[in-house]
Amino acid sequence: MSDTEKSAQAQPNESAEPSFRYNAKLAQGIEEKWQKIWDDEGTFWAANVNGDLKDGKGHNAEGRPSYFAMDMFPYPSGKGLHVGHPLGYLATDVVSRYHRMKGENVLHAMGYDAFGLPAEQYAVQTGQHPRITTEQNIANMRRQLHRMGLSFDNRRSFATIDPGYVRWTQWIFSRIYDAWYDEDATNPSGSRGCARPISTLVEQFESGKRAIPGFEGKAWADLSEAEQADVLNDFRLAYISKSPVNWCPGLGTVLANEEVTAEGKSERGNFPVFQRELRQWSMRITAYGHRLIEDLDTIDWPEKVKLMQRNWIGESHGASVHFDVETPNGVKDMEIYTTRPDTLFGTTFAVVSPEHHLLEDVPAEWPAETPEDWKGGYATPVEAVKAYRLAAEAKTAKDRVDEAGEKTGLFTGLYAINPITGAKLPLFTADYVLMDYGTGAIMAVPGGDQRDYDFAVKFGLPVIYTVKPLPESGDDLANYEGKAPFVSHDGIVINSSIDATKAKGDSLSLDGLRVDEAIDKVNAWLESAGVGKGTVSYRLRDWLFSRQRYWGEPFPIVYGEDGTPHLLPDEQLPINLPDVPDYSPKTFDPEDAESDPEAPLSRNEDWVKVELDLGDGKKTYYRDTNTMPNWAGSCWYYMRYLDPTDTKHMVEKDEFDYWMGPDHNKTAGKSGGVDLYIGGVEHAVLHLLYSRFWHKVLFDLGYVDSMEPFHKLFNQGMIQAYAYTDDRGQYVPAAEVVEGPADANGEPTFTWNGQHANREFGKMGKSLKNIITPDDMYENYGADTFRLYEMGMGPLAESRPWNTRNVVGSMRFLQRLWRNVIDETTGEVRVTDGELDTKTLKLLNNTIADVTVEMEAMRPNTAIAKLIVLNNHLTSLDAVPRAAVEPLILMLSPIAPHICEELWSKLGHTESLAHADWPKADERYVGQDSVTAVVQIKGKVRAKLEVSPDIDPKELEKMALEAVADRLGGKEPRKVIVKAPKIVSIVPAE
């Protein structure tokens, strides 16, 4: 029997029930009632400092500490939510409700990330325009989330496709485009390096303070408009480049490195990705590499996410070295980056990427005595390079760098000159060198690198060892010579001495030094010789920012007849997408590496070609036909929650300082930012890194006052579920699977349509045919039961199994709470106003103290367990005292708000408990002795419970069974042995 069928059987029997029993029908009525009250009264409105959103439920921001909690907003690309999606939303809501009850001004809202590939692909599948399907999906998601009872300030909701939002996304792009990174300037946080308006760079060129690259000796005014644009393009933080990109024919667009899997496939769709040289927009995120690493120390994020970002950015210290390359067109410069400049004496050849510019200067004929196996069977270097470039384009990036793959390469006919030794190094091209990593050129040291060694062996190139093992290591270089490279950063430098260097004519010796000492010495020599310097490099590549899609933000850029880009003035924003029927991208055979992108907007000539006056009279311009990636809107959306009605500012300064500024509350710290951001760890090197980059640019330019967007990050786990396959391996509907008797090994059996079915455990998803929706839960149990079950399943940060059979346990808790307050027969309140006995006082105050700790630590599951203990105790009393049940209701309300609002109202309170004071423990009764009860199944400890020393054995048994319900699979145990208060031993049913 499937979980869905069992859930139906597990429903409380509503026939012949008392008239006022808490059941699914009553819950639905209560929930809809309170959701309407909350909406009508603006219960969850947060109060701004100024503007239209200043009033918040009769409160204002003055004197109230702010707290900003938010979720990673959803992509409205499917047909709605399943029960796994809201885990983070519910957690954020619980925290938000708790902080409101602490007297804080809480901002909690929800928007929709509506642009990008997911929404467009869904629209293509359904045959409708992306805007229509996206807005329908938003409406459905909004309904599902509203029905969940989430405490959003709905005045602050928006979608990234809203024209008013697109305007500010394009405005931010304009500021980034109109900025450059000055490494010598001091940023507002006091560290080195700062984004500055591009006008300040122009001033330096005009005044002569800075030489004009490529035009040394010329005045800025002597350059043409196109020449000036080209120079500035090399400095802008958003710039146009013709460079190797990840081209995905199956999707018809280019992808950022972060959107390509380790297998060289597109993250979405799993299509092959190829390296192509195309003209694209990029963002100079690498300029912020060091700050993006350094500032991780200022924020409260999971260490695993910090590590993922550090590794992705990949800061390394080494040297840039310039080699002269002799070409038919004169001596050219080849810059390489190496982390081991101490091995320059061991360089025996050099390698450039197939996309490297030096390959435009190869000779017409092979040099004399070129070995045949270096030529690859080609008559000339020109033919060889052309063919090799085509072959490289047809490979994925993963294929090119695969350590286990065959090392391919060709001699270019060129030689590079070692700046120290003067040795002529044959220059090869090989596809394992990528143009977008480092400089696209490497010096090869086969004595110290495995890949270089393999390449040298294949092409008969010399191997020079420049490092030997330390004497105390017990190792010897003889173990490697002629067999393998000696790859170590810890050793003694050898074979690295010369009487007269090529670049300076002086002597240089590194022999006898440790590697680190040799690196320092050679770096100093490189700088003194003018052929290099110590530098920092990053694994991180600049962010590829353009897509050949329809459903994205248009760029606020037009091009003149000469191709010069022009930024549109802010008053012309937003630039909206034209409403056209032909919005789908042109896709290709996934293996067609030779295909060329075709942006859908290029087909709309009336939109592309425009007459504009940009200050020098009306002229014809052409719009950029690329669109921004789906990450653009999500880079800054957190700030728009502060006031989406503001038409004058991206974010107004006073509002930013109040909600997100440095030290805006006791926990914000100097980094400032959102107080709590909940979302999946899968966004660690995508959205989270991009948002930090945009935020830092805006910080440098003075538009925001905090150096980080998100102060505290919390990654929720995943809700998992069973899925079922037939004997062909095809997934079958989980709701139609029937559980049969156990097999000979005691394992359950399953059938679908009378045929054997196999059960597996993993994700919940449409393709797995095991989706359970929140709507199912609302109908069968109510939103509060759903919230209570999901929050009580286990620690928020861990993945956990969904089991519909166990949802009824959460409903029974709410039913017991209801019965403690309401007479099920008459509907009358049944609490008393008597004083609490000592036992109840102790339990109540310890529960308040403990639950407060659990809520602060975001452990709602353990808070629920403690509230169950208190409620069970109240159930055992002859009469339930108001003084005990009201604090219980208040503490449960962040998790199950509707039933708590109803009970609070029935107890005579006229105001919503959403803003009631959180209970405070009376310290006189806190800290009383408790014991740890161990729950064992077949002798193995499966749970631990903190209980009162005088707990009733029956109550302990009930708590123990609830704690291990998932492990029992919904079956009654064969035997339970209770030794209160310390041990519960369970023998499960066979």
From Swiss-Prot:
Catalytic activity: tRNA(Leu) + L-leucine + ATP = L-leucyl-tRNA(Leu) + AMP + diphosphate
Top-level taxon of the source organism: Bacteria
Pfam family, one: tRNA-synt_1g
Matches recorded under InterPro entries: aa-tRNA-synth_I_CS, Leu-tRNA-ligase, Leu_tRNA-synth_edit, M/V/L/I-tRNA-synth_anticd-bd, Methionyl/Leucyl_tRNA_Synth, Rossmann-like_a/b/a_fold, tRNAsynth_Ia_anticodon-bd, Val/Leu/Ile-tRNA-synth_edit
SUPFAM superfamilies cross-referenced by the UniProt entry: Anticodon-binding domain of a subclass of class I aminoacyl-tRNA synthetases, Nucleotidylyl transferase, ValRS/IleRS/LeuRS editing domain
Region (Disordered): 573-602
HAMAP family in alphabetical order: Leu_tRNA_synth_B
Protein known as: Leucine--tRNA ligase
